[in-house]
Amino acid sequence: MGQKVHPHGLRVGVIKDWDAKWYADKNNYADLLQEDLKIRNHVKNKMYDAGISRIVIERVANRLKLDVYTARPGMVIGRGGSEVDALRKDIEQMTGKNVQINVVEVEDPELDAQLVAENIAAQLERRISFRRAMKQAMNRAMRMGAEGFKVQSSGRLGGAEMARTEGYSDGRVPLHTLRADIDYGFAEAYTTYGKIGVKVWINKGEVLPEVEDK
């Protein structure tokens, strides 16, 4: 089932950390989860062009702390911090809680599966050939030191009458190996022919357990 399950979810608690770092009892859990989803969607939609990879949410009492991982931190922060302040006020208004936002730069966007998937989707919307977009992304990632790369596009590719799935892969992407650091991203391209889904898997190497000194 390693082929079907979300690669990040499978590795949470093994080599990956949680994206929501809070605990709630059963009475509040659903409400807080829904609030998380609203926050993530709001940040993603408002800052889509900034290349947001992931958002980590921490909750302590009546406070919210957001770590926003982005390829373009300057775009999220804005001139003199104007954009990030506006974002903070939006979320405070939405939740009624005190909000702190940390902007974290993604060092290698070419090795971030979510950003790669969104980049390919953006190219498909600009009518660039899907094969060219996928191959270029794969070559860039492998040049940057990825151990393996897999990409898949599904839908009416090139405006074809019948939807199909096409993909490319290079190197090794062992989805069953839990110690393999597999990054996964998904994005959708809204074309005149309909939606095209883009999935990206990037193998960044194996994460070995730390050996304790005896």
From Swiss-Prot:
Belongs to the universal ribosomal protein uS3 family. Binds the lower part of the 30S subunit head. Binds mRNA in the 70S ribosome, positioning it for translation. One of its GO terms (cellular component) is cytosolic small ribosomal subunit. InterPro entries: KH_dom, KH_dom-like_a/b, KH_dom_type_2, KH_sf_prok-type, Ribosomal_S3_C_sf, Ribosomal_uS3_bac-typ, Ribosomal_uS3_C, Ribosomal_uS3_CS. This is Small ribosomal subunit protein uS3. Transmembrane segments: none annotated. Part of the 30S ribosomal subunit. Forms a tight complex with proteins S10 and S14. SUPFAM superfamilies: Prokaryotic type KH domain (KH-domain type II), Ribosomal protein S3 C-terminal domain. GO terms for biological process: translation. Residues 39-107 form the KH type-2 domain.
